[in-house]
């Protein structure tokens, strides 16, 4: 079964107020339960802000901060299984509704395991 990465595009403007965040977290909990119950859930996780990032380059150079500067960053991800892109997009719509943020859906390459 194909796997897909769902990435949350989070603005750098800060977190919503506590009441809104409580509602979002409740909606995310319901979405994650629905993903688990359907057998589509593989992994999910929220990320710290871009200021916590460290970039390691092939030449050994290590720098603090995100690789790219921008007004948005990846705030969290899901890895899901879905029979096809349409099914993954349906999960993406649910994720966008739960988070109130844009969700990017990308299929993993179909390569043999190492």
Language-model segments: which ranges?
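Conserved, structured core segments of small domains
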Residues: 1-114
